[in-house]
């Protein structure tokens, strides 16, 4: 079985300037992995003929499947064809069917076609034209010096259409049967990346197949498991075996997989238990509620919230006793507990969660920036009451408080199920 090494070359100065994200490469890499094709390199090059040619030469020297996205349009800075022609000397010819399609596009809309649009119908002599039903510029396949070159439009909608209709079936014919690659992302909360890696260090050091890759994300610590097998079932069985070994050590921090978020899981937990929840937010200013309602089905479990930012509103709306506010302050365990209890009672939910704290830039009530209190009430009883000292800028502290709130609810509901 031949070992194929794939590379994506994305052409476009707008990618280098950060004006748009290279989502094409992410999507293609994910899809190609399911075909057992190893993606070794991503290259981004601007709209400069010499640099485009250099990028192509480098790709030719180290890869045998090369997918080029972008640079197939009608303008002078669309230089993919020219760069490849300069490297290979292959002549460009006009594809009759593509040209008729482009002419028909303008005729049907009563518009005059400018001469530069003919450029979009030019393909390399002897190439296989990849039909673009979602746009005008066709894709191309060229076999050059033992390398398989695929040229696709840069517009994501067109690139995906050609890939699904033409590229992937063509690749299967070109490469034959490859070993299947399957991946799963395990998500953890309440544990740092370094602690997680240390706990699993012997498994990571011995990894071969599946591979184990710890990663840090904004809202979770994740482990990506990747297995390679002769069949999908074989690869999935290897993933499941390794997953069991990992969860035997850090299962208490595990909450979900792949695209699942902590708020997705919390909503599901609430639904499974038949619980409703409300929120009283001060430091988070509605962030918790916003994240919760982003989940489909949240209306079944989330009744509403109060954003009580000022002390007066905490006292008037949430009925936090004035003696607590004046003696212990609004950034206190007593205030947080009262907020959680009272929002539960006022909105009439099973659970209530509260957030109060100091996001900065200045300290408050003699307490440092980053001081946060989070409480959870279950009916008349405060069941969780925690103090945290977060670091970072204002919004980072608020984000961490919100995430910690989801973690506390998740752990509490987990203990109830």
Curated annotation (Swiss-Prot):
Cited CDD domains: cinA (cd00885)
SMART domains per record: MoCF_biosynth
Top-level division of the source organism's lineage: Bacteria
Coiled coil: none
Family membership noted in the UniProt record: Belongs to the CinA family.
Protein name: Putative competence-damage inducible protein
Organism: Oceanobacillus iheyensis (strain DSM 14371 / CIP 107618 / JCM 11309 / KCTC 3954 / HTE831)
């Amino acid at each position: 079985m031949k070992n194929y090494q794939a590379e994506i070359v994305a052409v476009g100065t707008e990618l280098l300037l950060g004006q748009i994200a290279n989502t094409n490469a992410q999507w293609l890499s994910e899809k190609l992995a399911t075909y057992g094709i190893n993606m070794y390199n991503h290259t981004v090059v601007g709209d400069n003929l010499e640099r485009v040619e250099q990028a192509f030469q480098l790709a030719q020297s180290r890869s045998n499947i090369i997918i080029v996205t972008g640079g197939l349009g009608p303008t002078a800075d669309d230089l993919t064809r020219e760069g490849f022609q300069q490297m290979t000397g292959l002549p460009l010819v006009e594809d009759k069917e593509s040209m008729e399609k482009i002419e028909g596009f303008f005729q049907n809309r009563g518009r005059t076609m400018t001469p530069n649009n003919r450029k979009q119908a030019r393909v390399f002599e002897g190439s296989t034209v990849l039909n673009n039903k979602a746009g005008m510029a066709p894709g191309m396949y060229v076999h050059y010096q033992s390398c398989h070159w695929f040229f696709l439009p840069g517009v994501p909608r067109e690139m995906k259409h050609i890939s699904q209709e033409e590229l992937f079936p063509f690749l299967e014919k070109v490469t034959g049967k490859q070993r299947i690659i399957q991946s799963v992302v395990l998500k953890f909360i309440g544990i740092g990346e370094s602690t997680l890696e240390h706990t699993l260090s012997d498994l990571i050091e011995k990894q071969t197949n599946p591979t184990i890759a710890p990663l840090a994300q904004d809202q979770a610590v994740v482990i990506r498991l990747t297995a390679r097998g002769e069949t999908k079932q074989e690869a999935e069985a290897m993933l499941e075996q390794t997953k069991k070994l990992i969860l035997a050590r850090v299962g208490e921090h595990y909450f979900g997989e792949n695209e699942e978020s902590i708020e997705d899981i919390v909503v599901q937990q609430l639904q499974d238990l038949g619980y409703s929840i409300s929120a009283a937010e001060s430091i988070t200013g509605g962030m918790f509620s916003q994240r919760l309602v982003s989940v489909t089905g949240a209306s079944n479990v989330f009744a509403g919230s109060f954003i009580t930012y000022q002390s007066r509103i905490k006292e008037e709306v949430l009925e936090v006793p004035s003696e607590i506010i004046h003696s212990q302050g609004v950034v206190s365990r007593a205030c947080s507990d009262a907020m959680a209890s009272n929002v539960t009672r006022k909105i009439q939910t099973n659970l209530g969660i509260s957030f109060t704290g100091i996001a900065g830039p200045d300290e408050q009530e003699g307490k440092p920036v980053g001081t946060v209190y989070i409480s959870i009430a279950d009916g008349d009883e405060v069941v969780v009451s925690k103090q945290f000292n977060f670091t970072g800028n204002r919004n980072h502290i608020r984000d961490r408080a919100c995430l910690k709130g989801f973690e506390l609810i998740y752990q509490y509901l987990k203990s109830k199920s």
